[in-house]
Amino acid sequence: MSHIQPTLALTEDLIRRRSVTPEDKGCQDVLIERLTAAGFECETVISGPDHFRVTNLWAVKRGRAGTDGKLLVFAGHTDVVPTGPVEQWHSDPFEPTHRDGKLYARGAADMKTSIAGFVVASEEFVAKHPDHAGSIGFLITSDEEGPAHDGTVKVCDLLRARGERLDYCVVGEPTSVSTLGDMVKNGRRGSLSGKLTVNGVQGHIAYPHLAKNPIHMAAPALAELAAAKWDDGNAYFPPTTWQMSNIHGGTGATNIIPGHVTIDFNFRFSTASTPDGLKARVHSILDAHGLDYTLDWTLGGEPFLTERGELSEALASAIQAECGVTTELSTTGGTSDGRFIAKICPQVIEFGPPNASIHKIDEHVEVAFIEPLKNVYRRVLETLIA
């Protein structure tokens, strides 16, 4: 039996479970069985309304120092995005299939391989270091790809209420680009969305003097918002960006000036800006143009940043040893559950396989990356809590 098989076997077991958000489909039961056998105490946390029940897992194995020792947590999600048109896949998206050295399936890269890797890494670590000093934790949810209202954030709230102290967290998101380990995420930008409605007066398009066209009135303000410089970024983050995603106005008829226009927009912002500061600037610009408007805000997540420290150095060293790659710290990409964990954990780093195929038809992971991924995770455990 080759050394790669335990991680690969667990990955394939998880993949076969059709755990589209918010369904877990027994994935966490598999993890609980494995982790319990390795000495973990496991707790299931069910959350969400009846029509959107979310399954969460908190598992911990205390080291000899008990709660006084360092606690390293792996965070991940068992849920996957929908497959899209199944007929466009070259194989069943929920039947792990090997072609050309790759494992094809929904969740192969995002992120069932990472989960399997850290479980097997923990099993190997515990077997080799039965008297380990620090503690190991798992925070797993089935609501990361969806609204994320009843997943990781709920467990973080529970841990905060209990006074649980997390020292390090590795999030298994697929962060690599061209090869395993070439990039890890030591932070993420925040996301702030707005729904702006500018009011005018509806009328016949042939009589504009009897109407007020909200599209025309909004256009100069939107141009100013699009051209604005929000901040300069910093050493870790690029400058904040503002983008419109949708504009809708009118009834569909071509002879009516609309009574209002609605614009959806989004900020991706760095630690150089704050939500309140960005909101204030938007309102200032809109007010300066004399618009009659309403604006509803949704904060998708605050930015977070882990500066170079013990966790990033442990990961970089492990990646160099196992992959022969010098990793790059990056804050690019979308939001992740790291934004919730960063509120209760001072060092949060994301690391997983290449992400080029995630959420796509024929999602896959290189089979040759699976064992090194597990080994990197094990080395991090050995460095920080052995």
UniProtKB/Swiss-Prot annotation:
Family: Belongs to the peptidase M20A family. DapE subfamily.
Keyword terms, alphabetized: Amino-acid biosynthesis, Cobalt, Diaminopimelate biosynthesis, Hydrolase, Lysine biosynthesis, Metal-binding, Zinc
Pathway annotation from the record: Amino-acid biosynthesis; L-lysine biosynthesis via DAP pathway; LL-2,6-diaminopimelate from (S)-tetrahydrodipicolinate (succinylase route): step 3/3
InterPro entries linked to this entry: Bact_exopeptidase_dim_dom, DapE_proteobac, Peptidase_M20, Peptidase_M20_dimer, Peptidase_M20A
Active site: D79, E144 (proton acceptor)
NCBIfam families: dapE_proteo (TIGR01246), PRK13009.1 (NF009557)
Species classification: Bacteria, Pseudomonadati, Pseudomonadota, Betaproteobacteria, Burkholderiales
Main function: Catalyzes the hydrolysis of N-succinyl-L,L-diaminopimelic acid (SDAP), forming succinate and LL-2,6-diaminopimelate (DAP), an intermediate involved in the bacterial biosynthesis of lysine and meso-diaminopimelic acid, an essential component of bacterial cell walls.
Domain of life, source organism: Bacteria
Alphabetical GO biological process terms: diaminopimelate biosynthetic process; L-arginine biosynthetic process; lysine biosynthetic process via diaminopimelate
Protein name (Swiss-Prot/TrEMBL): Succinyl-diaminopimelate desuccinylase
Reactions the enzyme catalyzes: N-succinyl-(2S,6S)-2,6-diaminopimelate + H2O = (2S,6S)-2,6-diaminopimelate + succinate
Cofactor detail note: Binds 2 Zn(2+) or Co(2+) ions per subunit.
